[in-house]
Amino acid sequence: MIYTIEVQLDEGITADSELVERAAAAVLAAEQMPEGCEVGIRITTDDELHRLNRDFRGVDAPTDVLSFADDGHDSRFVVAPDQPRYLGDIAISYQRVLAQAAEYGHSPARELAYLTVHGVLHLLGYDHEQGPAEAARMRTREEEIMTILGLPRE
């Protein structure tokens, strides 16, 4: 499948953008999303994730990943039926990637891929905050996709 995955690395961040693209595409393919879907992913700083979390979620604390789904209900814009489906944007804190990889005892690459998978699943409607059953469903799907990527739990 062909998807448009735009990865932006903030200045000074040396994350593997190809891994991010591959992880996002793996989720879209596993979820059987139609070709042409678009996702934007920004790898940024802890300070920026803190600001976004505060401004958009009302939570005055840093976090590792945020997803901003495009629900397609903005009546100000008309999109032709044959246009690609824009799913939304994801922001990932690279400092959290490094810290959590060390904390959990796995590679930064695995953590970066995991947070990408987690964020894309949120764009597709998965939400671990909706209770234990949904959290378990999301975690199972994350691990299935991480295995597809060759990055299972160690």
Curated annotation (Swiss-Prot):
Binding site for Zn(2+): H118, H122, H128
Cellular-component GO terms for this entry: cytoplasm
MF terms (GO), sorted A to Z: metalloendopeptidase activity; RNA endonuclease activity; zinc ion binding
Cofactor: Zn(2+)
Keyword annotations from UniProtKB, A to Z: Cytoplasm, Endonuclease, Hydrolase, Metal-binding, Nuclease, Ribosome biogenesis, rRNA processing, Zinc
SUPFAM superfamilies per record: Metalloproteases ('zincins'), catalytic domain (SSF55486)
Example of a GO biological process term: rRNA processing
Main location: cytoplasm
Keyword Metal-binding applies: yes
Keyword NADP set for record: no
EC number assigned by the record: 3.1.-.-
Cofactor note: Binds 1 zinc ion.
Compartments where found: Cytoplasm
Disulfide bonds: none
InterPro entries per record: MetalPrtase_cat_dom_sf_prd (IPR023091), YbeY (IPR002036), YbeY_CS (IPR020549)
Annotated NCBIfam families: rRNA maturation RNase YbeY
Function comment: Single strand-specific metallo-endoribonuclease involved in late-stage 70S ribosome quality control and in maturation of the 3' terminus of the 16S rRNA.
Family of this protein: Belongs to the endoribonuclease YbeY family.
Listed name of the protein: Endoribonuclease YbeY
Classification of source organism: Bacteria, Bacillati, Chloroflexota, Chloroflexia, Chloroflexales
